[in-house]
Every structure is written in C-alpha cells, then in structure tokens.
Curated annotation (Swiss-Prot):
PANTHER family: 30S RIBOSOMAL PROTEIN S16 (PTHR12919), SMALL RIBOSOMAL SUBUNIT PROTEIN BS16M (PTHR12919:SF20). The keyword Cell membrane does not apply. Gene3D superfamilies: 3.30.1320.10. Belongs to the bacterial ribosomal protein bS16 family. GO terms for cellular component: cytoplasm; small ribosomal subunit. It comes from the Bacteria. Pfam families: Ribosomal_S16. GO terms for biological process: translation. This is Small ribosomal subunit protein bS16.
Length: 83
C-alpha cells in the first residue's frame, strides 16, 4: 500500500521531517517515490514550519495513497493556512 508519511532528518535533538510518498513496507527513512513537502517542528521566527505541495498530495490521494495520522493533521493545518 502507498502511504504519505514523515521521514526524519536533521540532527540529534533537532528534528526535521520530509513528507514522503512511499510503500508502507519500506523503512521510515528508506526508499521513497516522491517528496511532497517538509515539516520543521522547531521552526521559530521567520522560518517556515510547514510546506506542502498541495497539487502533488491531491494527486497521490486520488491514486489511493493513505496519509499517516500525523500527516493527515498536517494536511488539514496546511489547507487551513492556505485558505
């Protein structure tokens, strides 16, 4: 099954996540089909906290991709910010 989920990056104590489209059987930070955005939970000031390529996310959801629980929350947040 194809999922949209977070892949962790950054360094120790400074997490940074990429929103990736991947096969659910692949490792968390392993091979992916496409990166569709990023999430920086410790962004402050003028730094961008969340960036989502809404067009590509809509495409993958129409193809049957399932977002993880956290990604579903982030997509709602991004849609709310865009409106």
């Amino acid at each position: 099954m194809v999922t949209i989920r977070l892949a962790r990056g950054g360094s120790k104590k400074r997490p940074f996540y990429h929103l990736t489209v991947t096969n659910s059987r692949n490792a968390r930070d392993g091979r992916f089909v496409e990166r569709v955005g990023f999430f920086n939970p410790i962004a402050s000031g003028a730094e961008v906290k969340l960036s989502v390529n809404q067009e590509r996310v809509t495409y993958w959801l129409s193809q049957g991709a399932q977002p993880s629980e956290r990604v579903a929350q982030l997509l709602k947040e991004a849609a709310k910010a865009a409106a």
